[in-house]
Amino acid sequence: MEINPIIVIGVPRDGDGDPKAIKTNWQRAQESGIGCVIINDDMGSKAANAAKKAGAYVYVPDHAGEPPKSNYETDSGAERVARSLATFDRFYNHDIVINVHAKLPEMAADVIKAVMYPLADPYVMFSTFVVPISKEEAQSDDIIKAQIEIHPKRRVQVLTNSQVAEVTGFTRKISEAGPGPYYKQIPIYAYRRGALDKFVRYGPTVREMEENLEPDRALANGMRVGAVLLNSGLDA
């Protein structure tokens, strides 16, 4: 089946994105050769100006800077992306949406491409990245941890030291979760477009609101989430 992905780099909600990081990640996204790349500046900030001067397409939707219109909407990246795509791509030309957080450190172009590999399974609705976690990170509630089941026979062709897996749980507090091992989740996502719309319609779970744990919404509603285990980090 032919796919037509779009990469969306989101400017942080507070508008306090690092202009250099936004520009660099836009350049890596372009180098990946996946398809259309836009910077979603739904806050109407100036953080993406450096990338714009370098040739990036910065999309400032009509609702830029407006607060959510209903009491169940959150500041989650998925809702922001879905809301902007509803106008930017209202005819659904793009069937895969790759959401890259602008505050991430520099990453290799092949890493962005690799996030789509779990979607080769037609029952996986979206995918993300996980990396080995340090002891300090494991104890920090600021970091989302993932429990995964690795598919031993599935590897990512563009990244030799990586494996395809399926996520079985997300948590911030290991003390309240089941047995590990745990991995650090990296906030890059590849959504099937229909699954993204469904994800947003579900609305946040109580646990998501309490722990700021957006990916939990998918598992709580029976959506399968794939993962790519990066053993070499984002700059692989």
Task: Name these PLM-found stretches.
Residues 65-143:
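Conserved beta-loop-beta/alpha segment of the NTase-like Rossmann-fold superfamily
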Residues 180-236:
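Conserved alpha/beta core of the MobA/IspD/sugar-nucleotide pyrophosphorylase nucleotidyltransferase superfamily
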Residues 13-15, 61-76, 232-234:
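Short, acidic/turn-prone active-site loops that include or flank metal/cofactor-
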Residues 107-205:
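Conserved core of the sugar-phosphate nucleotidyltransferase
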Residues 33-60:
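Acidic donor-binding segment of Leloir-type glycosyltransferases
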Residues 2-42:
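N-terminal glycine-rich phosphate-binding loop and ensuing alpha1 helix
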Residues 18, 47, 74-78:
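Conserved donor sugar-nucleotide recognition element shared by glycan-biosynthetic enzymes
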